[in-house]
Amino acid sequence: MADQMIFKRCEIKYMLDITQAELLKNQMKQYMTADEHGVSTICSLYFDTPDYLLIQRSMEHPVYKEKLRLRSYGMADKDTTVFVELKKKYESVVYKRRIAMTEDEAERYLLFHEKVKDTQITREIDYCLKNYKKLAPAVMLSYEREAFYAKDDHEFRITFDQNILWRNYDLSLCKGIYGEAILDKNKVLMEVKTAGAIPLWMVHFLTENQIYKTSFSKYATAYRTIYAREQRRSCPPEKFFVFTGDEVVQQAIKC
């Protein structure tokens, strides 16, 4: 899927423990094939405004939302091919546009607005860059992904993400793969990606194992931690605002 540039699909997330994930992988063998790349490391550099406008809007669960990120498969250097991705979501359907270029070209394009080849995709990315003022690297995310696709429908995919790390410093794909963990070691984030319906065998497995969809977001989870830490530094000692789920509640704590 690394060479595909346009996507339209539904993406449904589930939180599993390792035992559930291994049980599902075993059952998947008759229906799905492992991606040829096996387990891969994905690095995503998310862009946002200085006040995190994009992720804040996303967390409000609007009908339409979008994210801009720079992605590599494994740690990059200046000559590595990376992908500038604009991910939009409208009424639960994901539309993803991306273009490939070197890390150095991507940095000059996104940070210094150097011209690139004019295409429909670059025009959409350019509009995003103009619409949100002062977009800059905000959060670096990395994780290990194991991907599978259906034997009879390559548009149906399942991915398992583990070792999800984040940081809001050293914001470059070339700076290494490290950061703070988002999930417990026993947890696995599963994503079902499909342009159509979920197969019955998958529905039966989820039902039998009482596995339910979640709205978990890697970037939003990292942002909640950033927000909480900023509140600790700036709030009066007797009061502090923290995120609970997608809402902000006031708690009396000691800073």
Give the ranges of each region predicted by the language model.
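Phosphate-end processing signature that detects enzymes handling 5′-triphosphorylated RNA
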Residues: 1-255
